[in-house]
């Protein structure tokens, strides 16, 4: 079983290396969009601009929404390899528990999956496609009104 694992690991590494080589070989051409690279390379100011636009559309909510600086972590869950500055929307529940707010947002359509930090719910925009911004606004307005 040990040698089978090494062979599978080598195969995975070889395929990954080929993908990266193909991507890097696109000199002068428009590189294909790779979502994770798009997420990692988005400038913080672009995230802030998106957050300001989203936040401006949420002023009617009874829940305070603010924009905060945060960190995104890359790598495997328990062993993050790097931290990248990011921007998050911070939602403070009013008249509702934090757990209930998170559960309602996760159960919505579309599901909004953020994380809890202290007594706030955060939605890190580095993990959201720009094309999803309006869907998030609509879902938050519908869910939290």
Pin down the residues of each PLM region.
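Short, small-residue-biased leader/transition segments that mark boundaries at the very start
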Residues: 1-7
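Generic secondary-structure signature for well-ordered alpha-helical cores
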Residues: 3, 18-28, 52, 56-63, ...
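Structural motif of enzymes handling amino- and sulfur-group chemistry
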Residues: 8-58, 70-71, 80
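Conserved C-terminal alpha-helix-loop-beta "cap" of PLP-dependent enzymes
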Residues: 48-131, 135-136
């Amino acid at each position: 079983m040990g040698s089978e694992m090494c062979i599978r690991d080598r195969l995975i590494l070889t395929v990954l290396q080929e993908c990266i080589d193909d991507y890097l070989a696109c000199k002068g051409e428009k590189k294909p969009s790779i979502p994770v690279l798009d997420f990692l390379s988005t400038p913080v100011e672009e995230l802030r601009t998106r957050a300001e636009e989203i936040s401006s559309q949420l002023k009617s909510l009874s829940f305070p929404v603010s924009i905060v600086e945060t960190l995104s972590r890359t790598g495997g869950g328990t062993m993050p390899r790097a931290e990248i500055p990011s921007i998050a929307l911070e939602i403070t529940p009013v008249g509702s528990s934090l757990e209930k707010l998170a559960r309602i947002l996760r159960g919505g359509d579309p599901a909004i999956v953020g994380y809890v930090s202290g007594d706030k719910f955060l939605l890190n925009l580095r993990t959201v496609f720009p094309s999803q911004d309006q869907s998030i606004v609509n879902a938050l307005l519908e869910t939290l009104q």
